Amino acid sequence: MQQYLDLMKHILAEGVDKSDRTGTGTRSVFGYQMRFDLSKGFPLVTTKKCHMRSIIHELLWFLKGDTNIAYLRDNKVSIWDEWADENGDLGPVYGAQWRSWPTQSGEAIDQISQVIAQIKSQPDSRRLIVSAWNVGELDKMALAPCHAFFQFYVADGKLSCQLYQRSCDVFLGLPFNIASYALLTMMVAQQCDLALGDFVWTGGDTHLYSNHMEQTALQLSREPRPLPTMTILRKPASIFDYQFDDFALSNYDPHPHIKAPVAV
């Protein structure tokens, strides 16, 4: 994942120092893009160990339409703990918007079911989009969506996906985001009987937190290793029927984990 290291170098060289909501401070660039050919390996960062188990459980949690962290806690995933209220609720975050976007008439739109049906019936559509950025409900969310919307694209029998991330914590969050959406693309491709194309990541405010600089320097001192392979072991009847044990990551040989504080 040399692209990921190149992004870090770009921020350090070309970024500007900015204040932020958390009060931590960042070095930031605006507008950046990376492209990963999913047929050439699973894009999981190798210059530090990433917790793929948490990534899988979080994605399955999104797809359930869940917005309470009980499922995550039951599976020893703590990445949302800092934002949940005393009951474990987060408000209408990703899962709610993906699976039950509210309409003015009081009904709800299941965007995931809708986009899969559209990929199957209208693969050339330019409207294969899922959005988590519901302006009318932002004030009810514990955290406004960082990975705000994504679009699918079908060409030559291959499925590609582009994510727009309006705000990106490059050291801690980005490796999770890339792996999560790459895996989602694999799942949707399987459900739609398509081969794998590219995952394209596009960032808005793309930043390194000021208290991640030592960790960034350590990571930049390491050489990337070959990408691992992700295998989906079965094809369930629906995108919503995948289980944790359906995914097998192989040949992942990362450098050691690098600990860093989360800006809340």
UniProtKB/Swiss-Prot annotation:
Class of the enzyme per the UniProt entry, highest EC level: transferase
Pathway recorded for this protein: Pyrimidine metabolism; dTTP biosynthesis
Key word Transferase present: yes
Residues that coordinate or bind (6R)-5,10-methylene-5,6,7,8-tetrahydrofolate: 51, 169, 263
Top-level taxon of origin: Bacteria
The entry's keywords: Cytoplasm, Methyltransferase, Nucleotide biosynthesis, Transferase
Pfam families, per database record: Thymidylat_synt
Localization (cell): Cytoplasm
Cysteine disulfide partners in this protein: none
GO molecular function, one term: thymidylate synthase activity
The protein's Enzyme Commission number: 2.1.1.45
Binding annotation for dUMP: 21, 126-127, 166-169, 177, 207-209
Active site per database record: 146
Catalysis: reaction(s): dUMP + (6R)-5,10-methylene-5,6,7,8-tetrahydrofolate = 7,8-dihydrofolate + dTMP
Keyword Metal-binding included in the entry's annotation: no
InterPro entries: Thymidate_synth/dCMP_Mease (IPR045097), Thymidate_synth/dCMP_Mease_dom (IPR023451), Thymidate_synth/dCMP_Mease_sf (IPR036926), Thymidylate_synthase (IPR000398), Thymidylate_synthase_AS (IPR020940)
GO CC term, one of those recorded: cytosol
One GO BP annotation of this record: dTMP biosynthetic process
Summary of the function given for this chain in its UniProt record: Catalyzes the reductive methylation of 2'-deoxyuridine-5'-monophosphate (dUMP) to 2'-deoxythymidine-5'-monophosphate (dTMP) while utilizing 5,10-methylenetetrahydrofolate (mTHF) as the methyl donor and reductant in the reaction, yielding dihydrofolate (DHF) as a by-product. This enzymatic reaction provides an intracellular de novo source of dTMP, an essential precursor for DNA biosynthesis.
NCBIfam families according to UniProt: PRK01827.1-3, PRK01827.1-5, thym_sym
Quaternary state and interactors: Homodimer.
Family assignment from sequence similarity: Belongs to the thymidylate synthase family. Bacterial-type ThyA subfamily.
Designated name of the protein: Thymidylate synthase
Gene coding for it: thyA
